[in-house]
């Protein structure tokens, strides 16, 4: 059975941004693009900065605005394309990341096998936020 909610049943909350207006805190973010677009490099650079408590600048009214610093935070980086040991960890290190603040899936498959419950648990385990 499909579970549906009316809009009137949903509590509206303000978005807390990791990178305004691109990436919200605490949500799954999927990046798609052509090979060679530097998706991995961009996301691992953001994760590396986040591991040091540095947020990317926000885009507000067409201008880049410096974001405040925060406590170092974790990233769960899931991929079906790159191996952690040969691609993602070296790129994360090159960007200056603290390896204690990044977590990777332990499998390289075409399809993710994490259930919603497993992903929620992973976020809870690695989260520094309430």
Residue ranges and their predicted role:
Residues 51:
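Gly/Ala-rich phosphate-binding loop of Rossmann-like dinucleotide-binding domains
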Residues 1-18:
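N-terminal pre-Walker A segment at the start of P-loop NTPase domains
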Residues 29-32, 76:
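Short hydrophobic/aromatic beta-strand immediately N-terminal to the Walker A/P-loop
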Residues 35:
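The conserved Walker
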Residues 38-39:
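Conserved glycine(s) of the Walker
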Residues 42, 46:
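Hydrophobic positions on the alpha1 helix immediately C-terminal to the Walker A/P-loop
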């Amino acid at each position: 059975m499909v579970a549906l909610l009316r809009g009137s049943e949903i509590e509206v909350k303000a978005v807390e941004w990791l990178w305004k207006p691109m990436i919200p805190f605490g949500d799954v973010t999927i990046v798609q693009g052509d090979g060679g677009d530097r998706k991995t490099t961009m996301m691992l650079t953001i994760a590396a900065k986040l591991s040091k408590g540095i947020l990317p600048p926000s885009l507000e009214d067409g201008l880049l605005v410096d974001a405040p610093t925060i406590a170092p935070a974790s990233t769960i980086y899931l991929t079906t394309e790159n191996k952690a040991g040969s691609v993602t960890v070296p790129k994360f290190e090159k960007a200056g990341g603290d390896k204690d603040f990044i977590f990777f899936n332990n499998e390289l498959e075409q399809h993710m096998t994490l259930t919603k419950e497993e992903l929620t648990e992973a976020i809870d385990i690695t989260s520094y936020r309430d």
